[in-house]
Regions:
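N-terminal beta-strand-loop-alpha-helix module at the start
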Residues: 1-47
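Internal gly/pro-rich beta-alpha loop/helix module
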Residues: 124-153, 167-172
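Short Gly/Thr/Asp-enriched flexible loops that form oxyanion-binding sites at enzyme active sites
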Residues: 101-120
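Active-site rim beta-loop-alpha module in soluble metabolic enzymes
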Residues: 154-163, 174-176
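Short beta-strand-loop elements within alpha/beta enzyme cores
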Residues: 89-101
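Conserved small/polar residues in nucleotide/adenosyl-binding loops
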Residues: 184-186
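Conserved acidic residues
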Residues: 64, 91, 154
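A glycine-rich helix N-cap at a beta->alpha junction
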Residues: 53-84
């Protein structure tokens, strides 16, 4: 699976008690799953402010860097993300289930899959194997049940809370990691 082009989309979260910016919990699970699949070759993308210090919490998970598609807080992330994913030739796109800040409708994975014309897996718990252009995955269902699915590449998947928990963010790697600014013209 090392040759697989995995992209994880991240956002800025909000602490439930204090409201302070933090690493979004579901997005961090998506990064963890991406790291298990692609290691340091994982591409992590954020659409928003490149000066957001909270992005370093994701770098602290062991990422050498991440890409920021610069845009205002009010801008729709969908067009920029779709164009970036097509240019990057992504094969597997991992997202959280719902943003913790902003609109937080949970529609991004659905709209992104529709725009790209790719299948969508909701509630991804694990990617078991990838054989050629097909992946075998486990989808989380209510009451701890799982469903094994086969899906063609490329596809979009929203990661469930049943996926592996995200590792802690370490200060050193968070400071050493790089933020690459990418300009997408829509």
């Amino acid at each position: 699976m090392a040759d697989l082009n995995v992209v994880t989309l991240i956002s800025i979260g909000s602490h439930p008690a204090s409201g302070r910016p933090r690493r979004a919990e579901q997005d961090a699970r998506a990064v963890e799953l991406g790291l298990q699949l692609a290691g340091e070759k994982l591409n992590v993308v954020h659409a928003g402010d490149p000066q957001e210090e909270t992005l370093r919490a994701y770098l602290g998970m062991g990422l050498p860097g991440l890409t920021v598609l610069e845009q205002s807080r009010e801008a729709d992330a969908l067009p920029a993300l779709a164009e970036h994913l097509q240019l990057a030739k992504a094969q597997l796109v991992l997202t959280g289930t719902q943003a913790e800040t902003g609109e937080g409708s949970g529609m991004l994975p659905y709209l992104l899959a529709e725009r790209l014309g790719w299948p969508l897996i909701v509630g991804l718990a694990e990617v078991e194997s990838i054989d050629g252009n097909t992946a075998q995955v486990l989808q989380a269902l209510p009451r701890g049940q799982r469903r094994r699915l086969r899906v063609r590449l490329p596809f979009v998947a929203s990661v469930d809370s049943a996926a592996p928990a995200a590792r802690q963010s370490a200060f050193g790697p968070a400071r050493r990691g790089t933020l690459e600014l990418s300009l997408i013209h829509i």
